[in-house]
Each structure stands twice: as C-alpha cells, then as structure tokens.
UniProtKB/Swiss-Prot annotation:
<keyword id="KW-0274">FAD</keyword>
<dbReference type="GO" id="GO:0008360">
    <property type="term" value="P:regulation of cell shape"/>
</dbReference>
<feature type="active site" description="Proton donor">
    <location>
        <position position="249"/>
    </location>
</feature>
<feature type="domain" description="FAD-binding PCMH-type">
    <location>
        <begin position="24"/>
        <end position="197"/>
    </location>
</feature>
<protein>
    <recommendedName>
        <fullName>UDP-N-acetylenolpyruvoylglucosamine reductase</fullName>
        <ecNumber>1.3.1.98</ecNumber>
    </recommendedName>
</protein>
<dbReference type="GO" id="GO:0008762">
    <property type="term" value="F:UDP-N-acetylmuramate dehydrogenase activity"/>
</dbReference>
<dbReference type="InterPro" id="IPR016166">
    <property type="entry name" value="FAD-bd_PCMH"/>
</dbReference>
<feature type="active site">
    <location>
        <position position="173"/>
    </location>
</feature>
<dbReference type="InterPro" id="IPR016167">
    <property type="entry name" value="FAD-bd_PCMH_sub1"/>
</dbReference>
<dbReference type="InterPro" id="IPR036318">
    <property type="entry name" value="FAD-bd_PCMH-like_sf"/>
</dbReference>
<keyword id="KW-0961">Cell wall biogenesis/degradation</keyword>
<dbReference type="InterPro" id="IPR011601">
    <property type="entry name" value="MurB_C"/>
</dbReference>
<keyword id="KW-0521">NADP</keyword>
<keyword id="KW-0963">Cytoplasm</keyword>
<dbReference type="GO" id="GO:0009252">
    <property type="term" value="P:peptidoglycan biosynthetic process"/>
</dbReference>
<dbReference type="GO" id="GO:0051301">
    <property type="term" value="P:cell division"/>
</dbReference>
<keyword id="KW-0132">Cell division</keyword>
C-alpha cells in the first residue's frame, strides 16, 4: 500500500529571487524560499536541520514589505488555501479562510455567497493571513470589526495556538503580530463573524459620491453596490502593482490629540481631519504630503504617485534604499511644515 503524502515535507528553493513576491517589485534574493501549502509545514520547520537555525520570514502577497537587502534566511511563501463556513447561528455566519488566500478574492467570495460585511475592504492587496497583522482598514471599516479568531503556528516550537481579538490586541494598522509577536508566528487560518443583519458603512464622502455617480441613493445601496463602488474608487486612485510597483498606502494617517489639532487648525484652517473616539483627531496623511508639494515628485527611481500622494511607487529599478530615502524626505517636510510625524505602514526587511 502506498504511503500517504507527507504534508510536512519542505521543498527548498535556493537563491530564490523575490521581485515577484513583493508588490513594490524590488529586486532581492532569499538564501532559501519554500512554498507553504499546509500548516504542518510551518509546524515542522523547527525540526528541519537545513533551516531551523536560519532567520525566517513569512510572506503572503508581499504588499506590506520593503526589501532593503537580500534576505540571508528562509522566506516562507504562505499559500495555504481554503474558504468555508465553519458554523452559523441565528445572528451570524462564522467564515474561515486559509492564510494564503488572496484577501480581495475572499471578500468577493463572501458576497457571492450572501454573507456581506467586508465590502468596504474590497481590493486591498495582500492575503487573509496578513490582514490581522496590519488590522487592515478602509472607508470607515477595520478588519477587527468582523474578526472572530485566528490560528497561528509559533515557528520556534511548531505549536499551534488560537488567538481571539483580545489577544491580538488590535490597534490602528497594528496588532500583537506587528509588535511583540513580530516574526514569531505564521497565521494559517482566520475566522470572521459576519452578522446576518447587514450594517452599511457609508460615512466616507468618496463612497457616497461614487454611489451617486451610479444613480444609487445611499439608503438604497446593496452590499454589492458598496463593493463595486469601493473597487471603482481604489482602481481610479491607486496604481496596479503589476503595472507600477507599490505597496498601497505607504504612511499611516496620523492621530493627534485635540489640543495639538486646535493649534494646527489655527495655522492651517483647511487641514483635512476626521474626529476619533476619546477626543482625538485623525489627519489625512495624503493631504499633508500633497500640501508639501510631493505629489508626482521623484527621488531617483522611487516616486510619489501623481494621483494619490499617499502611495510611493517604483518607476523601474528602484531599490529599497531608494524608497526609504524618498519616505524620509517626505517625513522631514511634513514634520517641518505641520509638526506631525508620519509613520510608514510597510515593514522594512
């Protein structure tokens, strides 16, 4: 009788080029790479003498990383697939997706199966497994709103652990996995709780304007209408990484307290802002960058996109150092003009 396949077996790819595995399209090489299609492969890493001693980097869609050098370790390409409803009750569906699933495809799948809620997060690049790390968000919705739990493998021990929202400690574009847990875990599956009573989130003017352009009143909008509107907005504003390398929004929108905001508004009355809980105020980083005159400008092969100042792009041949030099120049100008610190979203490796 033939032996069943070993789901934990690891096939190593030596001197693996990474340009196709990061949306900036930055050239870098990993000492090794491995395609991970089963959680058991993550769990077996610490027992594999070929790689157990090496630095490890889990990579999903590569939409939140800037390679500044070659990676002298093993890059683990998370390709764990699968989408399913694990259970439902009178109030909600509980939907699980593999960490390697493409985020946008997963959002589209939930809508196609009559389970709305995630439509404001349509077309965000990356994978399901990367979404909790960053607590992705757009157009008035953060991933944590519908998050239920996730399963992650601790790379040093191979032990699987389940994390609820409290343990993930989500913040604005932040989580445990971006702080204390950074580099320690691989997220293999995420479960979302999607309420059966749909709550449309139409607080952003861009969304209501797009609906209006389509002849749809906000109160009449369906989940599919919102999904289509968000997709159209993102495609109009953001470059396709396959055509122009980028990592989406490069900087977080800074959040400041009311006193600092009042002082800023006294100097800059038209500053774009959004009230936040606890009296804080979120500023539009793209507006700050644009006001500093950076939209469309370049430093070498790295540039600020000409339609969205929050997006840095690779015009061809840019290195990670080029991107970081541009980012620092922008940060310096925003700090000098507005007294505000911009924090990058991508992880630099």
């Amino acid at each position: 009788m033939p032996m069943p396949p070993d789901d934990s077996a690891l096939s190593l790819l030596p001197d693996h080029p990474l340009a196709a595995h990061n949306t900036f399209g930055i050239d870098a090489t990993a000492r090794f790479a491995a395609r991970i299609t089963h959680a058991a492969q993550f769990a077996a890493l610490h027992r594999d003498p070929r790689v157990a001693h090496l630095p490890q980097l889990v990579l999903g869609g590569g939409s939140n990383v800037v390679f500044t050098r070659d990676f002298d370790g093993i890059v683990l390409l998370d390709e764990i697939a699968g989408r399913r409803v694990v259970r439902e009750d009178d109030d909600a569906w509980y939907v699980e997706a593999g960490g390697g699933e493409t985020w946008h495809a997963f959002v589209a799948w939930t809508l196609e199966h009559g389970m709305p809620g995630l439509e404001n997060l349509a077309l965000i690049p990356g994978t399901v497994g990367a979404a909790p790390i960053q607590n992705i968000g757009a157009y008035g919705l953060e991933m944590k709103t519908y998050f239920d739990s996730l399963v992650a493998v601790e790379l040093a021990t191979g032990r699987s652990e389940r994390f609820d929202a409290a343990r993930c400690a989500f913040g604005y574009r932040d989580s445990f996995f971006k702080r204390e847990g950074r580099g320690r875990f691989a997220i293999v599956a995420v479960t979302f709780r999607l309420p059966k009573r749909w709550t449309p989130r139409l607080g952003y003017a861009d969304v209501t304007r797009e609906l209006d352009a389509r002849g749809i009143a906000p109160e009449a909008a369906t989940p599919r209408d919102v999904f289509d509107a968000v997709v159209a907005i993102r495609r109009a504003k953001l470059p396709d990484p396959l055509e122009l390398g980028n990592a989406g929004s490069f900087f977080k929108n800074p959040v400041i307290d009311a006193a600092r905001f009042d002082a800023l508004r006294a100097r800059v009355p038209d500053v774009v802002s959004y009230p936040q809980p606890g009296g804080q105020v979120k500023l539009a980083a793209g507006w700050l960058i644009d006001r500093c005159g950076w939209k469309g400008r370049a430093l070498g092969a790295a540039a600020v996109h000409d339609r969205q100042a929050l997006v840095l792009v690779n015009r061809g041949g840019a290195t990670g150092a080029d991107v970081l030099a541009l980012a620092r120049a922008i940060q310096d100008d925003v700090r000098k003009q507005f007294g505000v610190e911009l924090e990058p979203e991508p992880v630099c490796v």
